[in-house]
A protein has these predicted regions:
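Glycine-rich Rossmann-fold phosphate-binding loop(s) that bind the pyrophosphate
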Residues: 13-16, 37-38
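Short glycine/serine/threonine-rich phosphate/pyrophosphate-binding segments
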Residues: 17-21
Length: 131
């Protein structure tokens, strides 16, 4: 299904560059549309930097707990330190979802319309008009 929508600012892609541009354009009162084929936040937020750093952070915490088994720093842990991988993945997914919803909310309150889908055009040019 194709849809025609006129606007003053069209942003293709809701990654870190796209959503920041759309938020600012919306804050300036421009009729802004941002088109994203996946989730708002882009690769960095959805499957790159943020999820990777969450998993690295959790693994570092796990390693630090393991050091306390022998009373390191006067802290003792009784029993084995265990990792529940499904729970860890769920925790990471919750972080990603929360940040994704945060980006969508920022777009909404700025007045930028997020359209989930792919942007296509048969035109080979973009017409620029003075605002």
């Amino acid at each position: 299904m194709s849809e025609t929508r006129k606007c003053q600012v069209l942003v293709v892609g809701a990654g870190p560059g796209g959503y920041v541009a759309a938020i600012r354009a919306g804050q300036l009162g421009l009729d802004t549309v941002i088109v994203e084929g996946d989730k708002a936040g882009g690769t960095c937020l959805i499957r790159g930097c943020i999820p990777s750093k969450a998993m690295i952070h959790a693994s570092e915490r796990f390693e630090h707990l393991a050091h306390h088994k022998d009373g390191h720093m006067g802290i003792s842990i009784s029993g084995d330190v265990a990792l529940d991988m499904p729970a860890l993945v769920s925790w990471k997914d919750d972080i990603v979802e929360r940040l994704n919803k945060g980006v969508e909310h920022l777009l909404k309150i700025a007045g930028a319309e997020l359209i989930k889908g792919d942007f296509t055009t048969e035109e080979t040019f973009v017409e620029l008009m003075e605002c």
